[in-house]
């Protein structure tokens, strides 16, 4: 092997990959175009005195894996606080549904408004749990030998009642699935809001998986990193440094030299050349293989990657600093611990998604909030709070451009908050929008797409980003891919990073 292994991109997947390589004794250098590591797991003072996550505000998938334990991230400072209830539906008509880690507590909460709906939700979870348990080994990156016995048992449980109906449910859009299983928008709306959080629209075939995924929050919970999502990044950098690895920020890549189909070097903008025979990219795979790779990936592998889909629907954020928590009528202690959903109707979410796909601002604005300062006082001045507002169906490219439309986004978000929490405007100390343009330019995500590519049945698991590239290897000798656009999926998981590192290490020991 020539030179260090170069990891391109210091998001959490790139850092996870680097840690596993360094743990195996490899010399590793991570190069990052931004001035600090973290990617989607960054926390910054976007309003003076108030620290906000720039994208990921709650972590769950990584806590379903062995990655934190295998890298001893707790020993490097990783500290998670559970968010329970993980979600509260704040309906405009005053009804509340609290989704706790405990299914029984959740059923009791739903029963306060509708005993029939509560039992329907229980049946939906009975259906969802074995399906989630079946797909979990792939999400965790378990080996086939370890996973197969559990997968067979869970699949049998999932299919024991009417297997054809289960197959139909699995390939359905979650709009259809939720209408079959849940009787009203009391629970359909908030469950759909969580499914939309994955970046999947209500009418996308196969999107049902992300409504079934509601069961995963009951199984594993939802977690806030103390001090924000940056806590995970800091722990990974600490562990990597302790293992002898190196992170270089403000080091954008000009190209990856691979003459004759073999990696030779990573060349930084400015001309510095890092000689290497091994590279893992942890950025958008289309950027890595079609723009940075020199020569670009060709043949059917390149054509398939170029055809991978990226829709016009992404996420937009509004950070709001306040001097108190949102004053929801009929609130109870704990209502600010997790996600607070303002999606009242499944139809509204579908309408908003359609408008955003067409480049229009969504109307009505689908919105949810996190108030992490309710759990973590380090994020705001004493007695003050951080309110993180997220629209899961914002247009990447909007009619008129985001510079001209950002104020409309802010006004729509604040108006929604005022309706749900009367008097909210009077508590505001500062506002900072974070549009798809900002995520593109300051976050390094083309089009503001944190998942890099759409989440869809044909772009998930071993088909992500494409079938030919779904095992983290490329046709270029020494070049591997990782990140949200690779197998198995996006989100704060770390699995793509670990699996890419394992692929490289396995190939080098052959």
Question: Where are the model-predicted features located?
Answer:
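A glycine-rich dinucleotide-binding beta-alpha-beta segment and adjacent secondary-structure elements
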Residues: 184-198, 362-370, 423-487
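Helix-loop-beta segment of a Rossmann-like dinucleotide-binding subdomain
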Residues: 152-165, 201-235
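Mid-domain catalytic core of redox enzymes
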Residues: 252-380
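A conserved FAD-binding loop/helix module that cradles the flavin
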Residues: 56, 484-505
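N-terminal glycine-rich phosphate/pyrophosphate-binding loop and immediately adjacent elements
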Residues: 3-140
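Flavin-binding catalytic cores
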Residues: 114, 325-326, 359-364, 402-441
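Rossmann-like flavin
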Residues: 92-205
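Helical element adjacent to the flavin cofactor pocket in flavoenzyme catalytic cores
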Residues: 213-263
């Amino acid at each position: 092997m020539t030179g260090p292994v170069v990891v391109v991109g210091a998001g959490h997947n790139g850092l996870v990959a680097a840690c596993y390589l360094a743990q195996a004794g490899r010399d590793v250098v991570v190069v990052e175009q931004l001035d600090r590591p973290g990617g989607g797991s960054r926390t910054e003072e976007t309003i003076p005195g108030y620290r906000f996550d720039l994208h990921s505000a709650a972590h769950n998938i990584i806590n379903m894996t062995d990655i934190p334990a295998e890298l001893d991230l707790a020993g490097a400072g990783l500290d998670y606080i559970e968010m329970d209830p993980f979600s509260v539906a704040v309906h405009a008509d005053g009804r509340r549904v609290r989704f706790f880690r405990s299914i029984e507590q959740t059923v009791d909460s739903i029963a306060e408004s509708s005993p029939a709906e509560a039992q329907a939700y229980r049946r939906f979870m009975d259906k969802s749990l074995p399906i989630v348990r079946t797909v979990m080994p792939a999400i965790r990156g378990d080996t086939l030998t370890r996973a197969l016995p559990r997968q067979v048992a869970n699949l049998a449980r999932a299919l024991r009642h009417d297997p054809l109906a289960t197959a139909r449910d699995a390939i359905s859009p979650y709009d259809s699935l939720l209408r079959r299983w849940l009787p009203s928008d009391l629970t359909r709306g908030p469950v759909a809001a969580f499914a939309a959080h994955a970046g999947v629209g209500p009418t996308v075939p196969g999107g049902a998986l992300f409504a079934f995924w509601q069961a995963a929050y009951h199984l594993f919970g939802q977690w806030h990193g103390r001090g924000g999502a940056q806590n995970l990044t800091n722990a990974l950098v600490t562990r990597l440094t302790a293992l002898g690895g190196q992170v270089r920020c403000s080091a954008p890549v000009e190209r990856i030299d691979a003459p004759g189909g073999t990696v030779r070097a990573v060349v930084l903008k400015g001309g510095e050349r890092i000689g290497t025979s091994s590279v893992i990219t942890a950025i958008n795979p289309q950027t890595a293989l079609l723009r940075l790779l020199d020569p670009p990936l060709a043949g059917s592998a390149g054509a398939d990657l170029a055809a991978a889909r990226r829709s016009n629907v992404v996420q937009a954020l509004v950070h709001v600093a306040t001097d108190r928590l949102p004053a929801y009528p009929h609130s109870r202690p704990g209502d600010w611990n997790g996600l607070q959903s303002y999606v009242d109707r499944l139809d509204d979410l579908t309408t908003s998604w359609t408008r955003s796909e067409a480049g229009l601002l969504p109307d009505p604005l689908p919105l949810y909030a996190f108030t992490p300062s309710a759990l973590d006082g380090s994020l705001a001045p004493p007695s003050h709070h951080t309110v993180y507002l997220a629209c899961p169906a914002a247009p990447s490219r909007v009619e008129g451009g985001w510079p001209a439309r950002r104020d409309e986004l802010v006004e729509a978000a604040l108006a929604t908050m005022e309706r749900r929490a009367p008097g909210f405007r009077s508590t505001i100390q500062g506002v900072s929008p974070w549009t798809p343009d900002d995520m593109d330019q300051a976050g390094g995500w083309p089009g503001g797409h944190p998942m890099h590519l759409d989440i869809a049945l044909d772009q998930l698991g071993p088909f992500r980003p494409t079938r030919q590239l779904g095992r983290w290897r490329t046709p270029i000798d020494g070049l591997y891919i990782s990140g949200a656009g690779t197998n198995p999926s996006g989100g704060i998981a770390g699995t793509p990073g670990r699996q890419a590192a394992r692929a490289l290490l396995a190939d080098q020991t052959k």
